[in-house]
Design a protein with these regions (language model features):
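Primary recognition of N-terminal secretory signal peptides and signal-anchoring hydrophobic helices
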Residues: 449-545
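Sequence/structural signature of beta-propeller domains
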Residues: 24-451
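A general lysine-centric signal
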Residues: 2-3, 195
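Sec-dependent N-terminal signal peptides of Gram-positive bacterial secreted proteins and lipoproteins
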Residues: 3-23
Length: 545
């Protein structure tokens, strides 16, 4: 097991809505997530001989705090997505072409794992499989065309054969635990919300038009609900991963994505608009929500990520305020969905307000996707990444040159590949994605207590550090003048003035060094002049022992 420690200060941040900026300094520890052999996914289809012992199950689609084990180690519930899947060619049957995905392990069952973090690393040693209401294990296979939640994809095996659909299939993402100990999960297909008991058996399911607002059916395929959390008062919140694509017309112009609130008792829903900064992304659809976590009834932590307009990847955590956000459930624009509205037409609508809290990449984060976020009872921020079970599609052409499988069309009748209408020989296998699965814990740095020293003592300390200065007090102008290169000699009680941990209010006096004012507060305590040591060091460059 491995862990790594990163530390940095937040120096710059941008604010997309008019809110105060919240800044903090954190230390991050990253733990590689190991999975017990018994929980790995059996697989032997790699031509290169990877994955001896099976695929490492990807418990990285969401995370929530569970508590502590008997040794005091923190534990978390983490959820998989639909299971191992990889890019595939477009699939043509009888002249109809569909998008497709390769499911090398079609029997995989989406699961909830228990992650234990120790000083040595993180490990998943137990898991709960998800089941339908009758207790049958579900799969992560897509839904058939025509059903709410269908992505239009064909599910294929390694030989490009169709392997069918699952009307109960789930692509699970967010996770939270309610007051009764039940799990709530969200799904990217539908989007769906599901409530399962502690054993993983389905209790309730919500879909667009069946417990959820119908407009959610316009999610971009495979971009349904990506984040879920439960507020302290019990409201279930779920975030759509990207902007809606209403009638296939709004994914390139919409200015916001939606956060849905469900009252699990009354079944009433509300929707809030989370703003997308169109100046940051070349397309609004490139902005993706990774997960959400409720700090209180109206404040969230939210992962926003995606490829920026300059081509770089971004993974950021925002603090989101819903207290003044307006319920947009019944709002339209010129008789159509609100997604059709240009930004200037939305100025009077109360969007969620957001402020940058953490830029993950400033701490050394390199994974493409941060997909889970929560907090511990100690206020630590926990983030988990999804490495897609550590697999990728490997494609080579007839000359043995690596190529991109998504550039090809596979014809189900002739069992041949083509590219740009020209038949080609292609070899397809599953390779290793070496991106590690990790869980990161961010702890806010504790501030060292302030130390206040008298100006006279500061002069003595400066001299010892090789920066001699003299002192002159001018009560007429309320100034203390320090002159570099001149030695200050103290006598008597001046030497005995001790550092203080606290002082009174700021005085009117000012500190002048070589004719220039030093912009730090000056205090008077028992007739002596004091300054904060750290502030003096920062302003002068001195290192005072």
């Amino acid at each position: 097991m491995k862990k790594r420690v990163f530390s940095t200060a937040l120096i710059s941040m941008f604010v997309l809505q008019s809110v105060p900026v919240f800044a903090a300094e954190y230390e991050a520890t990253a733990y590689d997530v190991e999975v017990a052999d018994a929980l790995k996914v059996p697989f032997s289809g790699s031509a290169e001989g990877y994955f001896e012992g099976g695929l490492v199950t990807g418990f990285g689609s969401a995370v929530t705090f569970r508590g502590y084990d008997a040794e005091g180690n923190p534990q978390f519930y983490a959820v998989t997505d639909r299971g191992p899947n990889a890019d595939a060619p477009r699939y043509d049957r009888n002249g109809t072409t569909n998008e497709a995905k390769i499911f090398p392990c079609p029997d995989f069952v989406p699961s909830i794992g228990v992650v234990t973090v120790t000083s040595e690393g993180a490990r998943v040693s137990e898991a709960i499989t998800l089941k339908d209401a009758q207790g049958n294990e579900i799969s992560g296979l897509p839904l058939e065309a025509g059903l709410i939640g269908s992505t239009g994809e064909k599910a294929l095996d390694m030989e490009m054969n169709e392997i069918g659909y699952d009307a109960d299939g789930l692509d699970t993402e967010g996770i939270a635990v309610d007051a009764d100990g039940n799990f709530w999960l969200c799904d990217e297909y539908g989007p769906f919300l599901v409530k399962v008991d502690a054993d993983g058996t389905l209790l309730e399911k919500y879909a667009p038009g069946d417990g959820l607002p119908e407009i959610l059916q316009y999610r971009i395929p495979n971009r349904g609900f990506e984040g879920l959390t439960i507020t302290p008062s019990g409201t279930v919140l779920a975030s759509v991963q990207s902007v809606l694509d209403v009638n296939g017309e709004t994914q390139k112009t919409a200015c916001f994505t939606r956060i849905v609130a469900l009252d699990p008792v009354t079944k009433e829903t509300k929707m809030y608009a989370y703003p997308v900064d169109l100046s940051q992304y070349s397309s609004p659809a490139n902005c993706k929500i990774g997960d959400i976590y409720a700090i209180d009834d109206h404040t969230l932590l939210l992962i926003e990520q995606g490829k920026l307009a300059d081509g770089t990847m971004s993974n950021r955590i925002y603090r989101v305020d819903l207290s003044t956000a307006e319920d947009i459930s019944n709002l339209t624009y010129e008789g159509s969905a609100l997604e059709y509205a240009p930004a200037e037409a939305l100025q009077d609508i109360g969007f969620a307000q957001k402020e940058l809290l953490l830029d993950l990449r400033a701490y050394g984060w390199t994974a493409e996707k941060a997909e889970g976020i929560c907090m511990t009872d100690k206020g630590e921020i926990v983030v988990i990444n999804d490495n897609d079970f550590g697999i990728v599609t490997v494609t080579t052409d007839a000359n043995g040159v690596d190529t991109d499988i998504t550039d090809y069309v596979y014809n189900a009748e002739t069992k041949t590949f083509s590219k740009d209408g020209v038949a080609e020989q292609v070899s397809v296998s599953i390779g290793e994605n070496t991106e590690p699965a990790q869980i990161w814990i961010f702890r806010e740095k504790t501030q060292e207590p302030a130390v206040y020293i008298s100006v006279r003592q500061a002069a003595l300390m400066a001299a010892e550090a090789g920066n001699p200065v003299s002192i002159a007090f001018d009560s007429a102008s309320d100034t203390v003048h320090l002159t570099s290169g001149e030695t200050y000699a103290a006598t008597g009680t001046q030497v005995e003035q001790q550092p203080l941990a606290s002082v009174g209010s700021v005085s009117a006096w000012r500190l002048i060094l070589d004719g220039n004012e030093v912009d730090i507060p000056v205090y008077h305590v028992n007739g002596y002049t004091y300054v904060e040591q750290a502030e003096l060091e920062a302003a002068t460059g001195w290192k005072l022992a």
